[in-house]
Amino acid sequence: MENSEKLANSKEVIAYIAERFPKCFILEGEAKPLKIGIFQDLAERLSDDSKVSKTQLRAGLRQYTSSWRYLHGVKPGASRVDLDGNPCGELEEEHVEHAKASLEESKAKVAARRKEQAKKAREEAKAKKPARATTPPKRRPQPAAVAKKQEKPVETRALNSDEITVGNNVSVNMGKGNMPATIVEINKDDVRIRLSNGLQMVVKAENLRS
């Protein structure tokens, strides 16, 4: 027994009539312009078909003829076809211009809709993104304040002559304060010393401190 379940939507209707009338309705590629009044022909040919109603046929035809594929096919020099694919006269210029305008309008609507959808998507993504907490900038650690009270200078005294010996650890006045040093050579009043950084120099014995 043949399945008489009705078609669910216009897409299924278009697929069904393309299967029944393949020389007229095309599912892929550029469509052929349809004969004027083809709805009546369809309704008559499918009057006993319980799968599709006249209302469904009308809605399916409207969707088919408003598709970009169909509007692209409505161009100068093209011929309309009937259900069996037979030519039914060349397109009139008025119909070609109408199809061209409809195509441009349809594309403009799609472009505007896509633009609006993209804008909405950006706004939604922005709304979902957690707002950055306005934390104050991190303050860099300040160097320890220099004590107002300067440390008392270490009290030193001049060396006795018997303390000026090679290898003895002493302090030497370098102008900016005393620096530790070691005596490495003695030549009368001139004493060669080695600072803690390894630098050697000759100073007067009177500049050495204990």
From Swiss-Prot:
Biased composition (Basic and acidic residues): 98-127
InterPro entries registered for this protein in UniProt: ProQ, ProQ/FinO, ProQ/FinO_sf, ProQ_C
Keyword Chaperone: yes
SUPFAM superfamilies given in the database record: FinO-like
Region (Disordered): 98-155
Keyword annotations: Chaperone, Cytoplasm, RNA-binding
A single GO cellular-component term on record: cytosol
UniProt GO MF annotations: RNA strand annealing activity; RNA strand-exchange activity
Entry's Gene Ontology BP terms: post-transcriptional regulation of gene expression
Subcellular location: Cytoplasm
Superkingdom, natural source: Bacteria
Known role: RNA chaperone with significant RNA binding, RNA strand exchange and RNA duplexing activities.
Family named by the database record: Belongs to the ProQ family.
Protein name, per record: RNA chaperone ProQ
Gene name of the encoded protein: proQ
